[in-house]
Amino acid sequence: MEELTRSLVNDVEVLNNHFVSTGHPLPSFDRHTPTVVLPNDASPDAHAARERILDNALRLFQLAAGPSAYLLNLQTGYQYASCVRWLCHFQIFHLVPLEGSIAYADLAVLAKAPEPQLISVVRMAMTNGLFLESPPQHLAHSATSALLRNDADFHDWAVTMSDLSFPTAFAMVEAHERWPNSVEGNQTAYNIAVGSELPFFSHLAEQSDRKRQFAGFMRSMARSQGTDVEKLAEGWDWAALGQACVVDVGGSTGHTSVALARKYPDLNFVVEDLPEVVAEGPGYLSYLDDAQDLKSRIGYRAHSFFDPQPVQDADVYMLRMILHNWSFDDCVRILSRLVQTLKPGARIIIVDIVLPDPGVVSASKERLLRVQDLIMQQVFNSMERYLENWMDIFRKVDERLEVKRIVEPPGSLMSLIELSMAA
């Protein structure tokens, strides 16, 4: 513990020195604190120090708690999850004013919720950084709760997580008892949790509110450190393409293409997804400040990636957080459709997790990777993949399909896998 503490003290000093030298505000629970603790353009040393702080603080907590307190502390996880669902359902994030505070009694009336239970829930949530009690018997926003109020996409993430992800995770035992070793997309923990026989995306398509919330969740993931598209923009030499066409395969409403288009004005994009998804793309673009420029360079096309690829002359086919949703055989089918259309010099860019072996990366990072792996199993009967899993897929698609390079940008949970066809 002493060694971890010394490292923690040293890294906190490194991070504080960075904040002082750059003028970036110090981390705080105060509502006016920036939601991003360390911007992507901060120095590599600062990012490394922050990563070590997260890891060492986590390990110190685990060591200080010890085995006998493991289950005691485990309770907090599912209760935090329950609180988020309660707070979303009763619209507490939006009923608490951004400035100042509101009395519990008044908030309970607005929320149509019982005051004693309201107090219990929010005081539990406070121990995890949501809300502040100031003054006594009054509720005010913290930096984190204000984010969930102000940012509709992050609120959609919270709703999707609490209403769908939580019950799905708890149905994993029943799914594996009922369908051991299944790779079918409609034999999952999700199917048990929601009582549907449809695969996830087919079931989602029947529910307009859930579909909208899921799109918001995907946009918020694209802006979250570790999974944000800025890492994609920085992790590959997009500028070297010059004037080029990029197909955003399964690109939803186009949030990834938007981020790349803003940084690389020579690139044009075709966002492909199912008809009901891309139909919402132009509306998403129209709300952006730079909509006019983006509309001239980002187009939408209804397309299933299991069908022959209609765009034959693209320079890059990009699949960001797509293949992890699908089984081995489906991944082979998806990539085979792209290989059939690759012109000489064209690339396939896969942006997905490449799982490390246990203990290779920090525990604070590894647990986020393992979470994603479990989610893929629970929702799709798929998986996050180790490098050897990826290589097996590529060899099955075409022996000529070459991995040119694999890059994991600093601070990212995901890697960029560049593929091309051998001459």
Curated annotation (Swiss-Prot):
InterPro entries recorded: COMT-like (IPR016461), O_MeTrfase_dom (IPR001077), SAM-dependent_MTases_sf (IPR029063), WH-like_DNA-bd_sf (IPR036388), WH_DNA-bd_sf (IPR036390)
Induction info: Expression is positively regulated by the cluster-specific transcription factor aoiH.
Pfam short name (any one): Methyltransf_2
GO molecular function, one term: O-methyltransferase activity
BP terms from Gene Ontology: methylation; polyketide biosynthetic process
Enzyme class: transferase
The family this protein is said to belong to: Belongs to the class I-like SAM-binding methyltransferase superfamily. Cation-independent O-methyltransferase family.
Protein name (record): O-methyltransferase aoiF
Source species taxonomy: Eukaryota, Fungi, Dikarya, Ascomycota, Pezizomycotina
GN (gene name): aoiF
